[in-house]
Amino acid sequence: RYEDYAHLIEHYRGGYGQFSNVCMINEANYVPAANEKYTYIELGNIGSYGNITDCTVAYGKDLPSRARRVVHTNNVILSSVGGSLQSCALISSEYDNAICSTGFFVVRSNAINSETLLTLFKSEVMQNLLKQSCSGTILTAINHTELQKIVVPKIRKEVQDKIAENIQKSIVLRNKSKSLLENAKVQVENVIQTGGV
């Protein structure tokens, strides 16, 4: 139950705060210029590890009407849709100034580093708090007001630093494995094209 998960956080020895006091949400609407090209991130582009797996590059006139939020490096985007709350990602420098769907909350914090924020959003405790704050009948979602009420643990700085270090290491390794996979694919294609010679 919501009370049980909230109780866990409220008894965390490092303390806690309401989301509204710990995090900031960028809700500013940005209207893309019709003839400018943009990088657009939507729900389907979010990987299971809190990474962005793909994006759409398109002119403003070709983007959907929900493409209205600008994101910056180290923002964390969190899906507001009930069935996809686990879809959250850390914005890397590669996606600085990209646009994301209004189906995401764009979050940052001065008290919690981005990697820890991402880890919190993906944790079982926070996922359950988010789920239980959703409303709606056909398509449930969490709204801004309910999100602001959720309690967030204040993680100690040394723990945050360790989390950040581990997340950054995993990003480097993931990028390296992606590069190795691409190289392997090229080698296989070359072998096929040359008839195995």
PLM regions: where:
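A short glycine-rich beta-alpha junction/loop motif
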Residues: 84, 98-105, 135-161
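Non-catalytic DNA-recognition/assembly elements of restriction-modification systems
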Residues: 1-32, 156-197
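A short beta-sheet element
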Residues: 77-121
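A structural connector/turn signal
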Residues: 65-66, 94, 137
